[in-house]
Design a protein with these regions (language model features):
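Generic structural signal for well-ordered alpha-helical scaffold segments
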Residues: 35-39, 129, 133-141
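Active-site signature of alpha/beta-hydrolase-fold catalytic machinery across serine-
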Residues: 62, 156-160
């Protein structure tokens, strides 16, 4: 089974702002380019899941349009299944605030307890890992799946593959790599099992 982890296109937000579940649109042209690039590559029979945030849903809809109108592929299995477990982490009160305006003390507390601390008051990395692990466990055992999602969710998948739900000892344990906006990563399960 192949899991396609697709990151939404660049969001239409000022550089340097904290956003996780802040529901902002993605750049329409960048979304179209991503859909044009990925749609022909998606396997027949794949199931499409997307975050509940509009920047992910825009890409899911653009992929559907590419398959239907350009490629003339009527794969009704690629109707998107909205799954809020694929939403980005929620930064609570810090959503929409410039990163450099968030007090250093808030970052210090978060990095000292990166696993459990709810940065912004709503969701911890542990909470994110648990919901992403649940979404992974609910994937079909056969066929391929496509997740239209966010960098934090993709990092969570990569962490779960390596460590399972083991608590993060430090913030440095958290993966820093994620696909760039409008790109993707494919994982073969059988090679990568979720603990």
């Amino acid at each position: 089974m192949t899991l396609w982890l697709v990151r939404h296109a660049r969001p239409m937000i000022q550089e340097g702002l904290c956003y996780g579940q802040l529901d902002i649109p993605a750049d329409p042209l960048a979304t179209l380019h991503t859909a044009q690039a990925i749609a022909p590559l998606l396997p027949v029979g794949a199931t499409l899941y997307c975050s509940g945030l509009q920047r992910a849903q825009q890409l899911a809809q653009a992929i559907q349009l590419q398959l239907a109108s350009v490629i003339h592929d009527q794969r009704n299995t690629l109707l998107p299944n909205i799954d809020t477990r694929l939403n980005e982490i929620n930064f609570g009160v810090w959503e929409g605030i410039a990163w450099d305006e968030i007090p250093k003390a808030a970052f210090d507390i978060w990095t000292q307890d990166f696993d459990q601390h709810r940065f912004g008051g709503l969701e911890s990395v542990r909470d994110l890992l648990i919901r992403v692990q649940q979404a992974l466990r609910d994937l079909p055992t056969t066929g391929d799946a496509v997740w239209i999602t966010h960098a934090g969710v993709i990092r969570a998948v990569n962490y779960l593959i390596q460590y399972g739900l083991q608590p993060l000892a430090t913030a440095a344990t958290w993966p820093t790599e994620a696909p760039a906006f409008g790109t993707w990563q494919c994982l073969e399960f059988g090679q990568h099992e979720i603990r």
